[in-house]
Every structure is written in structure tokens, then in C-alpha cells.
From Swiss-Prot:
[4Fe-4S] cluster 1 binds at C67, C72, C78, S307. It comes from Pseudoalteromonas atlantica (strain T6c / ATCC BAA-1087). Keywords: 4Fe-4S, Cytoplasm, Iron, Iron-sulfur, Metal-binding, S-adenosyl-L-methionine, Transferase. The gene is lipA. Belongs to the radical SAM superfamily. Lipoyl synthase family. This is Lipoyl synthase. Signal peptide: none annotated.
Length: 320
């Protein structure tokens, strides 16, 4: 592929996606790949009927799930459980985070039909708890905030009893505008992931800012004190336990109540290299620390993801 700018709708993946970020990602050779330990287990269902049904429903309505786009290891379990995390605003991200498997490029304009299609799909599937996330849309003046509101309000209209969790981008350069817009469609849980420790931001989250993300969570909470705020991090990218504990303190200092900690799994040899597999006991220890410093919910375990059993997380059920 040439160095020409991608056309609208063109997806860049793997080496094409990460070759222009501030650091050089050298492909991880097969011999260098860390062997998965026995505790990294993907739970496969006995039948794929429900999984196939959800995929067909998404295709029929031209909808996307982050489960598929980000190659989540829990896809089979969650789809078979009848849950999905819907990804709005398309499937092309304006950022190039090297840990993430979502494609980069120039996104298409938001679909005006998506909010109603999404709401009708959720009603058809009779979902009681949904998570709505999005790609980063730095090309939009509001970062996509109005589209989030349109989706939330459409879901409320078609499924009044469905609980809605949003996992939002950082609204870089547009925080105040986005938060003002979000007042017109308030979710039941507000989630924004820090993803990693501040020392690794330049490598892992080019274009993002650690303090900005903390401030986004804090400002939302100040405006909506009754709505739980939530954040999550991946482990195994070069951080240590003490650095994670410091981030947990920062989150609590910014009034974040819910936490997820999970194992980073390298999507391909072109992505950010996995440095270690974190033992389940370390996740347990961090979960104890989280509760001790005031988190009301802490889902900590190798296979935990931000929206993994999000309904159970919100209900206070232990998730690992």
C-alpha cells in the first residue's frame, strides 16, 4: 500500500495501522510469543446457534459489536449468554492504539438510521442490560456525543426498562461540549477506560492523555452524582503491581466507583508486544486493594474485559 491517505471507509489493520505511531512496533516473531498459561481459557459453548443468531441480527441491521471488531476472547461466551457490546459510529477508528484490533482509517459519516436500528434490535433481542461503545471520532465536532445521546434516547423509547452502560472515548479537545450534550441522554453507568498506566501512554495510547481521561470521569460524576462511573485497565504491557495500585488511587481520587482489570492479549505479531501473563493471584490481590480504597465494584481477573458480564458487574456480582 502507498503512503497516500486512506479513502473514506478504507480499513487499515496490523502493520499498516501502527507504522505511523510515535514508537516503532517490531513484529513479534513466533518464537518470541509467550506461551499461554493454563489459566487463560476461552470458554466455548456446546452449540453456536445463539452466537450465529446474534451475528445474523447484527448483519441484518448493519450494526457492529466491539466483541467482533476488537477480537474479544470472550465473544463466544457473551454471545451465547445473549449479551453483546454494541459499537456505534462505525467500525473505523481515528486513533492508532497499537494494543487494539479495531481498524484505523477515515470513517464514514455517522448513520442517521443507526440509533433506531440499534434500539429496535435491542428490543427484538429483549436485552435487559446493554453496553454501548464507539470508535474514537476525532473527525466530529462533538466527538460523537450527540450520536450517543440519540442512541440512548432511542433505546429508552423502545425498551424503557433496559439498563444502559456507555463506554465512551475521551472526547479529545471537546470534553465540555460533549458533557453538555450528554446531559440530554444520561446512561445508567458511565464508563471510560484508562487502559494502562501513565508511563506507557505514549507507547500504548498515542493521542490520549492520562489526566484528561481522569478529568472526563470526574467532571461527569460532578454533573451526575447519582450515576456510577467506571474505568478499566489491561495488565501485561510492562507495568508492575505498584504502578497499577497508584492508578487505582488516582481513579478513586477522581470519584470513580467501578473497576475492571484484565489480561492484555496481543491481537497479532504487529501489535504492542505482550510482556507477561499476570497470575490470577495478582488480580485477586489488586481486587482486595481496590475494595480497601473504596471501589464499590471491582472485577479483576485474566479474562475480565470492560463489558464482560457488565450486567453482573453493575449488580455487584463477583466477576473474574
Amino acid at each position: 500500500m502507498s503512503n497516500a491517505r486512506p479513502q473514506a471507509g478504507e480499513k487499515l489493520r496490523d502493520d499498516e495501522k501502527v507504522k505511523h505511531i510515535p514508537i516503532t512496533i517490531m513484529p513479534t516473531e513466533k518464537a518470541e510469543m509467550l506461551r499461554k498459561p493454563e489459566w487463560i481459557k476461552i470458554r466455548l459453548p456446546r452449540t453456536t446457534d445463539r452466537i450465529d443468531h446474534i451475528k445474523k441480527t447484527l448483519r441484518k441491521n448493519n450494526l457492529h459489536s466491539v466483541c467482533e471488531e476488537a477480537s474479544c476472547p470472550n465473544l463466544a461466551e457473551c454471545f451465547n449468554h445473549g449479551t453483546a457490546t454494541f459499537m456505534i459510529l462505525g467500525d473505523i477508528c481515528t486513533r492508532r492504539c497499537p494494543f487494539c484490533d479495531v481498524a484505523h482509517g477515515k470513517p464514514l459519516p455517522p448513520s442517521a438510521e443507526e440509533p433506531v436500528k440499534l434500539a429496535k434490535t435491542i428490543a427484538e433481542m429483549q436485552l435487559k442490560y446493554v453496553v454501548i461503545t464507539s470508535v474514537d471520532r476525532d473527525d466530529l465536532r462533538d466527538g460523537g456525543a450527540q450520536h450517543f445521546v440519540d442512541c440512548i434516547n432511542a433505546i429508552r423509547e423502545h425498551s424503557p426498562t433496559t439498563k444502559i452502560e456507555v463506554l465512551v472515548p475521551d472526547f479529545r479537545g471537546r470534553m465540555d461540549k460533549a458533557l453538555e450534550i450528554l446531559k440530554n441522554g444520561v446512561p445508567d453507568v458511565f464508563n471510560h477506560n484508562l487502559e494502562t498506566i501513565p508511563r506507557l501512554y505514549r507507547e500504548c495510547r498515542p493521542g490520549a492523555n492520562y489526566q484528561w481521561s481522569l478529568d472526563l470521569l470526574k467532571k461527569f460524576k460532578e454533573q451526575h452524582p447519582d450515576i456510577p462511573t467506571k474505568s478499566g485497565l489491561m495488565m501485561g504491557m510492562g507495568e508492575n503491581k505498584e504502578e497499577i495500585a497508584e492508578v487505582l488511587k488516582d481513579l478513586r481520587a477522581h470519584n470513580v466507583e467501578m473497576l475492571t482489570l484484565g489480561q492484555y492479549l496481543q491481537p497479532s505479531k504487529h501489535h504492542f508486544p505482550l510482556k507477561r501473563y499476570v497470575h490470577p493471584t495478582e488480580f485477586d490481590e489488586l481486587g482486595v486493594i481496590a475494595k480497601e480504597i473504596g471501589f464499590t465494584h471491582a472485577a479483576c481477573g485474566p479474562m475480565v474485559r470492560s463489558s464482560y458480564h457488565a450486567d453482573k458487574q453493575a449488580a455487584g456480582v463477583e466477576v473474574k
